[in-house]
Amino acid sequence: QNLAWGIGTPIFSAFAEKYGDRKAITLGLILYALGVFISSTASSPEAHQFLNIIIGFGIAGSGFGPVLAVVGRSASPEKRSLSLGITTAAGSAGQVIGPPFAAILLSTMPWSSVFEIFAIISLFTIILVPFLKSKDTSPIKKNEEKLSDAIGQAIKDPTYIMLFLGFFSCGFQLAFITAHFPAFIAEASSPIVKGSFIGLFCNSVEGLGALSMAIIGLFNIIGCILAGALGKNFTKKYLLSLIYTGRTI
């Protein structure tokens, strides 16, 4: 899924450049919802792997990449940093709500039904796409430069290489935490005692794993908004260095 996400990102970027951001995001949402929904009925490892590729391409078309590109082009230069921070924080809000909601649903229904519910919720977000500011109305002039030329210039820029390596480590860390951290919390935790402080928020160790992801998302909201606000007044490369230092620690 993550590999498909990475491979699909430049493909959807080129698609958005040619056909528009709205169409690219809509296609991404459809692929994501379709992949998640059909996964609820998949019965073999091969089918799940194939559907994970579809989901990965869906994320590439509807995730942070294309959405932040729209926001970056639409926001004025003086408000761009904060706007990007708020948008990223909104994505983290889904991490705060999604895992606990999924844990609650899993306690009352099979996982396949939970997949179907989340697929339907994802599909309904298409109604927000028409409200996106069209690329054609952006004050930035259309760039006629070929994609191959742009990539050639980028790989010669040390700043781009550093950002590339930074995002490589970021993606590894994010994928590792998402895949293993909830299970680690569930396996390492003792049974939840009724009436305890933790018991006020969840009643199972599986729910504790979901709660841990929600807590990460909550602090990510704070960090995104703070970084966006600071980016208006401070040099971004130094802020980014501090952020990566904090993540390393």
Regions found by a protein language model. Name each.
Residues I30-S43, R247-I249:
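C-terminal ends and interior cores of transmembrane alpha-helices
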Residues N52-A89:
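Cytoplasmic helix-loop-helix junction between adjacent transmembrane helices
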